[in-house]
Amino acid sequence: MKRAAMIFALALAAFGAQAQGQKAYVIGVTAAMTGPAAATYAPVIEAMKAYVDHVNGKGGVNGHPVQLIVLDDSAEPSKAAANAKRLLSEDKVVMLLNSSLSSTYAPTVAEAKRANVPLYFAGSVCPKDTYPPADPMQFCSTAFGANLDSQAALAFVKANSKEAVRLGFAAMAIPIARAEIDYAEGLSKTLGMTPVEKQISPPPAPDYTPFATKLKEANPNWVYSWSPWVSQVRTFEALRRLGWEGRYITWSHLNAEDELARLRDPNLYVLGTNALFEDNVPIHAEIRAVTHRANIKYPVTFLTEGFISGMVIEAALKATPWPPTPQKVLAAMNNLKVDLKGLRGGPLEWTKDNHFRTKQYYRVWHWDSGKNAIVRVQDWQAIDVKR
């Protein structure tokens, strides 16, 4: 009798949990939470979770909690595919997120399309499919974006060079990074620069000296790198060990602010679209408070991207009528404007034709030896995102 009562109680508990789950907005995430790429992606998800917990603590969205289901793919395509299948078929998520290397995109996109569920790239590089004319199901809020970043970086190089530019290139051997550095090489020629060497390293390389050696031998006065941070910074450090004294511009990933302070090299420039904590905008205090309560192990300077992702999720769900379906969420995402409160140069805006943003704003920072601090050397420069 006791055994039967226990089974009945468990069944009631299971039913109650299921009912509660149906009352939540269920969002699925496949992310590189472990493995070599985790330092770039895990902080995004941890900060996003902290933001969602903060929202839930205030009553959720439209009176309903947001449930995040996060699965680790270790930046492996096969794991990302399995995660996407489970989240879509078993958990019935109304939105799927990818925060991993671009090598995981193809299987994730395929599963999302098959299930007709919107796919949101958060913390992972924005694929061109999110640019106008956008793929109907793919969206991205991540700071960095193919082609536009190289346009902004090389414009800065040109504006800050009195001598002829001899440009070296460095990238990781992953699809989007390789394509972007090839694009930048072609773009440099149209700007009157001379591309002198391009080095592509495996993900990750145990030693970057061979790649740096080839770059140094070509005698560039600038090097541009656009890849995961490990590739960017280790190539730079290897060049410095070899005695190269030129200027190096690279993408401002999550850890760039801390790394500028560690390296203290005035000729290392980082280009980005998220305000650094050194910029001290008011919402930085909220990020500190929310992520402190969540006891996140990463430095607060790593967490802006994830906070933005949480803001985007909240805004999309607020515009989604209850009960949520993937189609309702998609309709909300197709007409979305998110006030980022100074974390970027303007709001993030998606339209039916543009799932990236309508404007991309860039700043550039470096270490100032005289001030013994990180300083901004270029304020927000806007690039219109068009067809």
State what each model feature region is:
Residues 1-26, 385-387:
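Short, low-complexity disordered leader/linker segments with a strong preference
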Residues 18-29, 60-65, 158-165:
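Immediate post-signal peptide segment of exported/extracytoplasmic ligand-binding proteins
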Residues 24-26, 39-46, 58-131, 201-208, ...:
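Beta-alpha junction/loop-to-helix N-cap segments that form part of ligand/metal-binding clefts
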Residues 25-49, 71-78, 100-101, 170-179, ...:
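Extracytoplasmic "Venus flytrap"
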Residues 80, 127, 141-166, 206-209, ...:
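Hydrophobic alpha-helical segments within soluble ligand-binding/sensing domains
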Residues 93-198, 245-264:
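Extracytoplasmic ligand/sensor domains, especially the bilobed periplasmic-binding protein
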Residues 143, 236-307, 379-385:
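Extracellular/periplasmic periplasmic-binding protein-like sensory domains
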Residues 293-303, 314-374:
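Segments of small-molecule ligand-sensing domains
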